[in-house]
Amino acid sequence: MTVKEKIEQLRLQLHQHNYNYYVLNAPEISDKEFDDLMRELQDLEQEHPEYKDENSPTMRVGSDINKNFTQVAHKYPMLSLSNTYSENEVTDFYDRVRKALNEDFEICCEMKYDGTSISLTYENGKLIRAVTRGDGEKGDDVTDNVKTIRSIPLVLHGDNYPEVFEIRGEILMPWEVFEALNREKEAREEPLFANPRNAASGTLKLQNSAIVASRKLDAYLYYLLGDNLPTDGHYENLQEAAKWGFKISPLMRKCQTLQEVFDFINYWDVERKNLNVATDGIVLKVNSLKQQRNLGFTAKSPRWAIAYKFQAERALTRLNMVTYQVGRTGAVTPVANLDPVQLSGTVVKRASLHNADIIEGLDLHIGDMVYVEKGGEIIPKITGVDTSVRFMIGEKVKFITHCPECGSKLIRYEGEAAHYCPNETACPPQIKGKIEHFISRKAMNIDGLGPETVDMFYRLGLIHDTADLYQLTTDDIRGLDRMGDKSAENIIKGIMQSKEVPFERVIFALGIRFVGETVAKKIAKSFKDIEELENADLETLINIDEIGEKIARSILNYFANESNRKLVDRLKTAGLQLYRPEEDLSGHTDKLAGQSIVISGVFTHHSRDEYKDLIEKHGGKNVGSISSKTSFILAGDNMGPAKLEKASKLGIKIMNEEEFLKLIS
């Protein structure tokens, strides 16, 4: 046997033993025998570097090389799931799917593991890339760190896997490992991790993969993407993936009825406490991939899946005082300051009270014993008061009437729960909040700038709005507190680089009320530049897919404000991308210009989302509901009877897939 053949043999043996131990939980050799094989392979690879392989089992030990992570675009967006704590909303989801498909379907029920999401790409049976969720469109390349996780295969078993595919899952830290890690940190008098999810996420982002390897992370894989997948069934594909070497949850179950779904939920609401990893709910997915494609996606999440989250834990503690925070939109949020209490693995000292109505409804008094819950929110919330122990309490909590920062009288818009400070041009937290939003990662992504730096620049009078950032020079900021030459240069470089940020993110960065990332993308697709957007009327805005009257009026109000128009003009002068680039417009036609189109039914040739893109590409507008202004309906199979009746009553043309594709060809 040649040296090369011996190395290959050892690699195959170690991959198999690794799989037996970490995935099947059925080791065939002792730890010492495994270590001996590993040492033999390490020695041979060291003596023969010409046979180096990035997917060798020796790569799992990690390295102490320090590096920054590069960002990688996801081939398929990593959207989050819509979630609920309500069984009624699970029923609503099931009914929506049944109505939309109008045919038999199965629901795959899975544990919702509480870790950090990962996307793994394999080519020719080898792991080539591991990327975090990031912002859903791009994430950090953490391949070297993921290679240290022994339950993730570097090389696949068998040969019936697709040539290229992606598999997604959750990186986890088992409870036992988490508790041991926190004991070590406590002994070193270091801050403890709040929960296993934070520990897993923090570990995955460490620069030293040798430390990552020592943390004993685990992984469950839960979704397969790509061409030429084994079957049309999600559940069936994962069973195949298990044969290739992936760790797939054995707790998955296919359900034929809603009652079976609830039986699964109710069983695991109790039994999950006996699992060795953290879980916080159940994920429900339509099993057929074809049916998934037909159901499509909303802007933020798939229509074919939902996460049911188990009810949050709650704790009882004392309310000491209520303080108030002013956000970038001027919204004033009351915050309860509490005696520290342990809740869901974290120490809670503050909780949101949301608005004046909540305070009034709870009949809060200073000194009350209050119930605190922590569900999906980052900040816990107060859900009740234990009035049975109410004695020696202080005064009743009353919502403030004036801004705690600038003293302006607060206002409350009709139909809204929040109170607002109207002084948007001179209230410090609003100004700083707008700038912090502008520079944030999902907006202009300006490296080197953070809340503390923004606060310092504002206090020193260097910036008063976002456009002032583009007037800064290294001389302006060099020598400021903790600001050396290199830091100053990096900040100015980051500001200059932000001029290349695309139109949709600049729109988001403006901070227009109710205009989030998704709406900003819709706007950027609908207008060729900021001037078109500034001059758009209410009807034009409402006709944009997923933009209702509330968002449309907010956009109109923003541009009706002269100071906002001047700010946008200054940003334009600074060189920001306030227009769609020519390459975005290439391939676009005006074949559907001026037409408002409703999509309904289940399609064969393309998904609903693909048809929406085609409509926009050819100058049309996607609208969600039928009206007298609808140009035509693009109808697939099983179009809803209510829409059919309304279209008939209004005399609106119904077009099938073939007719539509011919129209735009």
From Swiss-Prot:
Chain positions recorded as NAD(+) binding sites: 31-35, 80-81, 110, 133, 170, 285, 309
Annotated SUPFAM superfamilies: BRCT domain, DNA ligase/mRNA capping enzyme, catalytic domain, Nucleic acid-binding proteins, RuvA domain 2-like
Domain of life from the UniProt record: Bacteria
Chemical reaction(s) catalysed: NAD(+) + (deoxyribonucleotide)n-3'-hydroxyl + 5'-phospho-(deoxyribonucleotide)m = (deoxyribonucleotide)n+m + AMP + beta-nicotinamide D-nucleotide
Keyword Ubl conjugation: no
Active-site residues per Swiss-Prot or TrEMBL entry: 112 (n6-amp-lysine intermediate)
PROSITE patterns from the UniProt entry: BRCT, DNA_LIGASE_N2
Record keyword Ribonucleoprotein present: no
Signal peptide: none
HAMAP family (alphabetical): DNA_ligase_A
Known role: DNA ligase that catalyzes the formation of phosphodiester linkages between 5'-phosphoryl and 3'-hydroxyl groups in double-stranded DNA using NAD as a coenzyme and as the energy source for the reaction. It is essential for DNA replication and repair of damaged DNA.
Protein name: DNA ligase
Species of origin: Bacteroides fragilis (strain ATCC 25285 / DSM 2151 / CCUG 4856 / JCM 11019 / LMG 10263 / NCTC 9343 / Onslow / VPI 2553 / EN-2)
Gene expressing this chain: ligA
